[in-house]
Amino acid sequence: MLGAVKMEGHEPSDWSSYYAEPEGYSSVSNMNASLGMNGMNTYMSMSAAAMGSGSGNMSAGSMNMSSYVGAGMSPSLAGMSPGAGAMAGMSGSAGAAGVAGMGPHLSPSLSPLGGQAAGAMGGLAPYANMNSMSPMYGQAGLSRARDPKTYRRSYTHAKPPYSYISLITMAIQQSPNKMLTLSEIYQWIMDLFPFYRQNQQRWQNSIRHSLSFNDFLKVPRAPDKPGKGSFWTLHPDSGNMFENGCYLRRQKRFKCENELALKEAAGAGSGGGKKTAPGTQASQVQLGEAAGSASETPAGTESPHSSASPCQEHKRGGLSELKGTPASALSPPEPAPSPGQQQQAAAHLLGPPHHPGLPPEAHLKPEHHYAFNHPFSINNLMSSEQQHHHSHHHHQPHKMDLKTYEQVMHYPGGYGSPMPGSLAMGPVTNKAGLDASPLAADTSYYQGVYSRPIMNSS
């Protein structure tokens, strides 16, 4: 400390003998021009803590050296701690190199400590840089913490992720009588979602447009319930309109049935000249299909097409009725197969591409039939209560098919294993055969064309 005080008492002209190169002044002045007050203040507090925790040699060396560097700085930094601005602006490597380069130009008493001082200062430089940037990061953190509050404040007024059909369905299902007037639907939506309290004319037009779909029915007022406007209720067949009760995604099965009913009605009116209603015709087709499958298929057995969805059974029955052919022509009778007969049936399906007992277009149907009966489809994920409700709309054999298919799907062996006992694996075996037949045919074809197998690249 005494040496430092003596050196600081020298005249400025004496310092020129210690700094032979003028670059030292230019580099320090450039650094001083680019420094800020915050970085120096943080470095001063940090350097004091570091010097207090360091050893005696290092703190003495750094103090002496900082006095030299501080004496060579511009007058604007003379009142601050020596060397604070110069070392705060340097990075780790640049600070170490700069201090090591200045070491030989210092006094002889400080030249042995040049390397040590460079190491100490170089290690502290990154922390000084980080602390000098900390006010900026703090402001950014405060601004980020402030944003979610405003976002959370306006989130309740955001548009809900439901379609208008979903909103109408929710309102009707949560009413005690399962029917609401148009004004009651409006009021329920506005009470639950504040977003719809604005621009009422726009979304109310969309609500009226959505009520015109086939999913909703208009119920006239009874004489004992006077008032204005008719009631609106859900279609009886649209009870499972949304997948697993989730109103974000709508199921396509009911939409498919509506389109097919309209197509069948148009085809019957133009070609057959029948005057029955579309609903009656669809029920007759469904009853005929169920009776045919029940009479031809023994108990515990399923035909290849019996596990198709109701939508496609309507399509197959309607097309066969319009053409004048019985519905049983598309699904031949199949006795209860033994394991040997199952293997023969699988080998027979793998053989010729055209089955003699089936029309050519029947080979293409099972591919999209089974898309609706995927193990993870909504039909197989339905609860037992929904299956019981589903069986009321259809005939009794559909309930038997659902149960048998559920037993097949819960069998631990999966698709490919043979079924022991009397439980038949009719649809599963046929599905495996139909899925494997084009692959086997293509493999044999390409093996005949090329001299070696396709997958063998060697």
UniProtKB/Swiss-Prot annotation:
InterPro entries, per database record: Fork-head_N, Fork_head_dom, Forkhead_box_C, FOX_domain-containing, TF_fork_head_CS_1, TF_fork_head_CS_2, WH-like_DNA-bd_sf, WH_DNA-bd_sf
Keyword list, A-Z: Activator, Chromatin regulator, Cytoplasm, Developmental protein, DNA-binding, Nucleus, Phosphoprotein, Transcription, Transcription regulation
UniProt cross-references to CDD domains, sorted A to Z: FH_FOXA2
SUPFAM superfamilies to which the protein is assigned, alphabetical: Winged helix' DNA-binding domain (SSF46785)
Matching PROSITE patterns: FORK_HEAD_1, FORK_HEAD_2, FORK_HEAD_3
PTM comment text: Phosphorylation on Thr-156 abolishes binding to target promoters and subsequent transcription activation upon insulin stimulation.
SMART domains cross-referenced by the UniProt entry: FH
Location of region: Disordered: 286-365
Tagged with keyword Repressor: no
DNA-binding region: 159-252
Main location group: nucleus
Tissue-wise expression: Liver.
Region (Transactivation domain 2): 361-458
Motif (Nuclear localization signal) on chain: 106-113
Self-association state and partner proteins as the record states: Binds DNA as a monomer. Binds TLE1. Interacts with FOXA1 and FOXA3. Interacts with PRKDC. Interacts with AKT1. Interacts with TET1; this interaction may recruit TET1 to specific genomic loci to mediate their demethylation.
Biological role stated in the UniProt entry: Transcription factor that is involved in embryonic development, establishment of tissue-specific gene expression and regulation of gene expression in differentiated tissues. Is thought to act as a 'pioneer' factor opening the compacted chromatin for other proteins through interactions with nucleosomal core histones and thereby replacing linker histones at target enhancer and/or promoter sites. Binds DNA with the consensus sequence 5'-[AC]A[AT]T[AG]TT[GT][AG][CT]T[CT]-3'. In embryonic development is required for notochord formation.
Entries under PANTHER family matching the protein: FORKHEAD BOX PROTEIN (PTHR11829), HEPATOCYTE NUCLEAR FACTOR 3-BETA (PTHR11829:SF167)
Protein name: Hepatocyte nuclear factor 3-beta
Lineage, opening ranks: Eukaryota, Metazoa, Chordata, Craniata, Vertebrata
